[in-house]
C-alpha cells in the first residue's frame, strides 16, 4: 500500500524462505475463499454457530485460511459484523454424540437428511417447517431446545416419499427428467447408504417408534404424540402447525422405522470484507479503498447470519458472477 492506494501484494514460498513483491497496475483482487479451514479463526469469530455444528467441510477449498480477509483488514478495510456460515443440515452423528466441536469430531455426511421428513428435538417436539432452507432448523433449534441436535424420522415408505418431495438443487436424490444435474443417488443408492449407516450405528432401524425414542433418549410420550399429530397433518393434507406444503408431508406408520441424530455442518464462511457495487473494499467511513477489490467468500455485504438458499447454487452463482463482473471492472 502506498498512501491510501493498494498497489500490489507480497507472496512467499510455503516455507516462507523467499518473498516476492507483485506490483499491480490496475488493482489487487482478493479471492482466497474465506476462513472455513482455519479452526482458530473460525472458533474465535463463530463460537455461537459452532455450538450447533458437528463438522466444517470446506469442499475443494482446503486453503480457506482467512489470509485474504486479514490482509484487507491490515489495509484498512472493515468486515461484516455478524458471523455467517453456509451451514447444511446433513451432519450425522452416533446416538451418544453431541455437536459443538466441529474441528475435532467424528461425524458423517448424510445426503438424505435434507429431505423434509419429520424432525424432532430431544423433547420429542417438532422444531419448524422441515421444508425450509437448510440452516433455518438449526437456528430455530438454538432458540428452542436444550440440545443442539435433532432427530430425523421416516418409515419404510421413504422411496415413494423422496420422489413426491421433489427437492431440487444439491438436496435432490432423484434426477429430474431432462436436467443436466450430476447423477444423484436415486432410490437404490440411497437404500445402500441407509443400510451402511445402520451397520455403522449412525441410523437406528426399529420395529416400533418406542424403540426409536429409547435408542436416542427422546421424550417418549411427547414423541409419540408428535408422530400421531404429524400423521394427522398428512391425512388432512394440511400442516396447521408450521404450514409445510402438502406434497412434502409424509406418514410414519409402516415399519420398519428409521431415525438418525443430526446437526449442522459448515461448508464455507460468508462474512467477509464490506464492498460496494464495484467490488471495492470499504473502510470504516464506508469509503472505497483505491486499488483493493474483494470477491467470493472473502467479500461481505451480501449475507447476514444465514444462508437462505431459496435458489439452487446461490453462493456458487454469486462467486462466479461477481468474479466475472469484477474482472471486467478492473480491466
Predicted regions span which residues?
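A glycine-rich dinucleotide-binding beta-alpha-beta segment and adjacent secondary-structure elements
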Residues: 208-211, 216, 222-306
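Internal hydrophobic alpha-helix adjacent to the cofactor/substrate pocket in enzyme cavities
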Residues: 69-78, 216, 224-227, 316-331
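An anion/pyrophosphate-binding glycine-rich loop and adjacent beta-alpha core
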Residues: 69-215
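A conserved short coil-to-beta-strand element within the FAD-binding core of flavoproteins
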Residues: 1-6
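Glycine-rich loop(s) and the adjacent beta-strand/alpha-helix scaffold that form part
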Residues: 15-18, 22-94, 316-319
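Short, well-ordered coil/turn residues at beta-beta hairpins
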Residues: 12, 24-25, 30-32, 122, ...
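Short, small/polar residue-rich loop motifs at catalytic or cofactor-binding pockets
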Residues: 112-114, 267-269, 312
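Hydrophobic alpha-helical segments, especially N-terminal targeting/anchoring helices
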Residues: 13, 120-121, 275-276, 282-283, ...
Amino acid at each position: 500500500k502506498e498512501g491510501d492506494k493498494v498497489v500490489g501484494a507480497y507472496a512467499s514460498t510455503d516455507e516462507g524462505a523467499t518473498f516476492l513483491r507483485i506490483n499491480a497496475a490496475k488493482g489487487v483482487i482478493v479471492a482466497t475463499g474465506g476462513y472455513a479451514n482455519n479452526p482458530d479463526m473460525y472458533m474465535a469469530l463463530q463460537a455461537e454457530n459452532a455450538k450447533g455444528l458437528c463438522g466444517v467441510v470446506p469442499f475443494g477449498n482446503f486453503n480457506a485460511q482467512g489470509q485474504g480477509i486479514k490482509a484487507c483488514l491490515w489495509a484498512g478495510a472493515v468486515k461484516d459484523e455478524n458471523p455467517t456460515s453456509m451451514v447444511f443440515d446433513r451432519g450425522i452423528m452416533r446416538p451418544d454424540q453431541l455437536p459443538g466441536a466441529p474441528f475435532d469430531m467424528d461425524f458423517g455426511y448424510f445426503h438424505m437428511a435434507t429431505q423434509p421428513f419429520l424432525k424432532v428435538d430431544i423433547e420429542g417436539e417438532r422444531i419448524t417447517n422441515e421444508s425450509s432452507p437448510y440452516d433455518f432448523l438449526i437456528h430455530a433449534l438454538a432458540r428452542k431446545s436444550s440440545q443442539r441436535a435433532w432427530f430425523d424420522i421416516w418409515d419404510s415408505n421413504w422411496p415413494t416419499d423422496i420422489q413426491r418431495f421433489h427437492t431440487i438443487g444439491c438436496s435432490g436424490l432423484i434426477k429430474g427428467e431432462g436436467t443436466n444435474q450430476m447423477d444423484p443417488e436415486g432410490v437404490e443408492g440411497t437404500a445402500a447408504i441407509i443400510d451402511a449407516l445402520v451397520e455403522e450405528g449412525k441410523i437406528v432401524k426399529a420395529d416400533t417408534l418406542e424403540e426409536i425414542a429409547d435408542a436416542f433418549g427422546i421424550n417418549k410420550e411427547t414423541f409419540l404424540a408428535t408422530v400421531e399429530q404429524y400423521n394427522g397433518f398428512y391425512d388432512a393434507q394440511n400442516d396447521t402447525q408450521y404450514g409445510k406444503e402438502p406434497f412434502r408431508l409424509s406418514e410414519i406408520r409402516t415399519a420398519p422405522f428409521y431415525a438418525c441424530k443430526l446437526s449442522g455442518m459448515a461448508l464455507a464462511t460468508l462474512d467477509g470484507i464490506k464492498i460496494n457495487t464495484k467490488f471495492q473494499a470499504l473502510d470504516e467511513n464506508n469509503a472505497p479503498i483505491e486499488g483493493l477489490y474483494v470477491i467470493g467468500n472473502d467479500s461481505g455485504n451480501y449475507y447476514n447470519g444465514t444462508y437462505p438458499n431459496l435458489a439452487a447454487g446461490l453462493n456458487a452463482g454469486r462467486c462466479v458472477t461477481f468474479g466475472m463482473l469484477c474482472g471486467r471492472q478492473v480491466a
